[in-house]
A protein has these predicted regions:
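Heptad-repeat coiled-coil amphipathic alpha-helices that mediate oligomerization/assembly
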Residues: 1-54, 181
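Conserved SAM-binding loop of SAM-dependent methyltransferases across substrates and taxa
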Residues: 96-108
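Short SAM/SAH-binding signature in class I
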Residues: 169-179
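C-terminal substrate-binding/active-site "lid" region of AdoMet-derived donor-dependent transferases
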Residues: 181-248
Length: 248
């Protein structure tokens, strides 16, 4: 009988703990849903503001969720285009950011955009989206379907876009780094952008790194700032995190 009482008491304690755990899980789930709705609302607002800035309807822009550049990141890009007034832009990873840049710089015949993409199908898709929207409209634009090849940097070997045959400008005013894809097997996938293109960066150049809250991008930023101490970093509180690098 004593053993039965002990078992019943133990079961009761377990049930109480499970009830408490269930309440905590419900609270966490509600919090996640709340912040998910907040972020979604903010991004919808940013998308509308961006569309207004570009002078287009909201539906003119391709989808800006999932893997695509988020509206808040694209708003940062638009602000930097106004600030830097770039002649030459290079971006790593084509897509909605390419369309945004082409629209922002439309009609400026002295401007050039070079966009890398490791996947030829993605590059072609971006080209088709641009054509549907009547872009680049006078601005020079190259979408380079550049496969990943080995680059040796400081004795280390990295996979990054093939640059041979790509018409890179001698002076880059704005460098957008939103590719290659970072994975657990290649956390520093975006690191080569700065060491490989550093000598082409103009005096007024600005570097923008998307997804800067992730561990891989954080590791990339750490190495960049250690290896290139003449640069300083500003973190912008976008949904995925944006890092802006400028010369000191």
């Amino acid at each position: 009988q004593d053993t039965l009482k002990q078992l019943l008491s133990a079961v009761e304690r377990i049930e109480q703990r499970l009830d408490g755990l269930d309440q905590r899980l419900n609270m966490l789930a509600q919090r996640d849903v709340h912040w998910g709705l907040v972020f979604a609302t903010q991004q919808l607002e940013n998308r509308q503001i961006l569309s207004d800035r570009l002078g287009v309807s909201n539906g003119w822009l391709p989808p800006t969720r999932g893997w695509a550049a988020s509206p808040d990141f694209l708003m940062v890009v638009a602000r930097l285009v106004d600030e830097v007034q770039p002649t030459n832009v290079v971006e790593c990873g084509s897509g909605v950011s390419t369309i945004t840049l082409a629209r922002l710089l439309a009609g400026q015949s002295d401007c050039n955009i070079v966009s890398f993409d490791h996947n030829e199908a993605f590059a072609n898709q971006t080209a088709a989206l641009l054509q549907e929207r009547g872009l680049p409209d006078g601005t020079g634009l190259t979408i380079a379907a550049a496969p990943h090849v080995e680059h040796v940097i400081g004795g280390e070997t990295f996979l990054w876009y093939q640059t041979e045959g790509v018409p890179l400008p001698e002076q880059i005013d704005l460098l957008l780094v939103d590719g290659p894809i970072v994975s657990s097997d290649n956390m520093l996938a975006r690191y080569p952008a700065l060491p490989l293109l550093h000598d082409r960066l103009s005096d007024k150049a600005v570097i923008v790194l998307d997804d800067a809250n992730r561990p891989g991008e954080q590791a990339t930023l750490k190495r960049w700032l250690e290896e290139f101490p003449a640069w300083t970093c500003e973190m912008v509180g976008t949904e995925k995190g944006t890092a802006i690098l400028r010369r000191k």
